[in-house]
């Protein structure tokens, strides 16, 4: 059997390689460190954690908690390492960085079916390949991707607006409309002059996230953060993302002084983004400001806005829910490159890409988890989200169908957690060949 290529030994690549090895498929794992380091990494270890050491909140009311549980059920190497290297962090799963990456490196390099190649990959390798090169993908490989799929399908920075859960929006304070009577695809949150004045002042006073040196970027005029627009003058936002021109509030028959527009992000209409509100503000500040917007006082934020260096694909244009490229059979993407955010999400997509690469090598059809599971919801978002202005995503409850019946928020989340884990477990049990138990991958 020919070796399957895995490019990149971060969390996604490590999990992809491990999944392939568990199914008896030989792997050639490419990692350019230490021959060529990135601005963010400091070692040559696999799955090096370079930012926060947290893999997200735990528990049955947390979306990341469901993804953690699914990955444990799947026999994830990343979750195995996280559980062994965990440190006290309240309700979150945090790890000792060195112990975590050291454990993963040792487990992988000790496997007889793994070949490690310490060199930069400058072209897409022939044969079955998983690309998991992360936010700091080398320029040469990025250029190769552009030549293959078009430069408009690859982004070099992440300028994302916050996304809120539709069910948490107060629709009595909003109206549906498009500008000048066009299709009513947008939700509009109108503001009075006094509401706008307070909102503008709060934007000026809000604290910004301080990026790492390697995250810093030059602003493109089409993607200036909303707080920077506010600094340019009192009226700048009124001629930009908050302009009311062509939007008539049916309750007053007039254009409001200012308006915040929301656009549907997923086919099911569960998630809506604030149009033109890309931001680098700290998350508590984002929450405070969003709750100043009429109709969003109690909005549940499922994804905060970000502004940072990030190389990722326009997944809805290029990938299916199996993480295989639509126009390149046997080529898969995982992790940040595939359009997810977060350590856990990267590892989870690495698992699925590795699983389907293994099935390809074994002559079997691809598979995808059920939509009720967090991983299933995540990859369906990647495959079906609006490709115009596509934003990377992390685990959140807006990715999975809501549960029926009247219940409180906590009970609803617990019901979604149990339903998702049950569906994911049933899917795992139905895989043929089955995934070996984790210890069975050891030789």
Swiss-Prot record:
Its main location: cytoplasm. Disulfide bonds: none annotated. FAD binds at residues 8-13. One of its GO terms (cellular component) is cytosol. It is found in: Cytoplasm. GO terms for biological process: tRNA methylation; tRNA wobble uridine modification. Its EC number is 2.1.1.74. It comes from the Bacteria. It is an enzyme of class 2 (transferase). It catalyses: uridine(54) in tRNA + (6R)-5,10-methylene-5,6,7,8-tetrahydrofolate + NADH + H(+) = 5-methyluridine(54) in tRNA + (6S)-5,6,7,8-tetrahydrofolate + NAD(+); uridine(54) in tRNA + (6R)-5,10-methylene-5,6,7,8-tetrahydrofolate + NADPH + H(+) = 5-methyluridine(54) in tRNA + (6S)-5,6,7,8-tetrahydrofolate + NADP(+). InterPro entries: FAD/NAD-bd_sf, MnmG-rel, MnmG-rel_CS, MnmG_N, TrmFO. Transmembrane segments: none annotated. Keywords: Cytoplasm, FAD, Flavoprotein, Methyltransferase, NAD, NADP, Transferase, tRNA processing. Coiled coil: none annotated. Its cofactor is FAD. One of its GO terms (molecular function) is tRNA (uracil(54)-C5)-methyltransferase activity, 5,10-methylenetetrahydrofolate-dependent. Belongs to the MnmG family. TrmFO subfamily. Catalyzes the folate-dependent formation of 5-methyl-uridine at position 54 (M-5-U54) in all tRNAs. This is Methylenetetrahydrofolate--tRNA-(uracil-5-)-methyltransferase TrmFO.
């Amino acid at each position: 059997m020919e070796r399957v290529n895995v490019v990149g030994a971060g969390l996604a690549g490590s999990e992809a390689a491990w999944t392939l090895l568990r199914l008896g498929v030989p792997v050639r794992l490419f990692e350019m460190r230490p021959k060529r380091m990135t601005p963010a990494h400091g070692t040559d270890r696999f799955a090096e954690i370079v930012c926060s050491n947290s893999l997200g909140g735990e528990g049955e009311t947390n979306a990341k908690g469901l993804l953690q549980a699914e990955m444990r059920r799947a026999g994830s190497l990343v979750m195995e390492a996280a559980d062994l290297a965990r440190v006290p962090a309240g309700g979150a799963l945090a790890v000792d960085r060195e112990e975590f990456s050291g454990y993963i490196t040792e487990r992988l390099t000790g496997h007889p079916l793994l070949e490690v190649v310490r060199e930069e990959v400058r072209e897409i390798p022939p044969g079955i390949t998983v690309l998991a090169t992360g936010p700091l993908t080398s320029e040469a490989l990025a250029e190769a991707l552009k030549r293959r799929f078009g430069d408009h399908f690859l982004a070099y920075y992440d300028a994302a607006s916050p996304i809120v859960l539709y069910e948490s929006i107060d629709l009595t304070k909003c109206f549906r409309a498009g500008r000048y009577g066009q299709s009513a695809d947008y939700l509009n949150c109108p503001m009075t002059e006094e509401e706008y004045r307070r909102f503008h002042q709060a934007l000026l006073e809000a604290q910004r996230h301080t990026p790492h040196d390697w995250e810093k970027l030059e602003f493109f005029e089409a993607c200036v953060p909303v707080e920077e627009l506010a600094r340019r003058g009192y009226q700048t936002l009124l001629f930009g993302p908050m302009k009311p021109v062509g939007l008539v509030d049916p309750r007053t028959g007039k254009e409001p002084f200012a308006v915040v527009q929301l656009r549907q992000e997923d086919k099911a209409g569960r998630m809506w983004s604030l149009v033109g509100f890309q931001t680098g503000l700290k998350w508590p500040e984002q929450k405070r400001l969003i709750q100043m917007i009429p109709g969003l006082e109690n909005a549940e934020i499922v994804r905060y806005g970000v502004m940072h260096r990030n190389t990722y694909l326009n997944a809805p244009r290029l990938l299916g829910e199996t993480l295989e490229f639509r126009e390149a059979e046997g080529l898969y993407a995982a992790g940040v490159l595939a359009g997810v955010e977060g350590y856990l999400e990267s590892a989870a997509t690495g698992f699925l890409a590795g699983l389907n690469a293994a099935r390809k090598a074994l002559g079997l059809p691809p598979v995808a988890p059920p939509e009720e599971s967090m991983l299933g919801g995540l990859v369906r978002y990647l495959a079906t989200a609006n490709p115009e202005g596509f934003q990377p995503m992390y685990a959140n409850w807006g990715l999975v169908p809501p549960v029926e019946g009247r219940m409180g928020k906590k009970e609803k989340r617990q019901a979604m957690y149990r339903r998702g884990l049950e569906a994911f477990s049933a899917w795992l049990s139905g895989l043929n060949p089955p995934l070996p138990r984790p210890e069975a991958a050891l030789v």
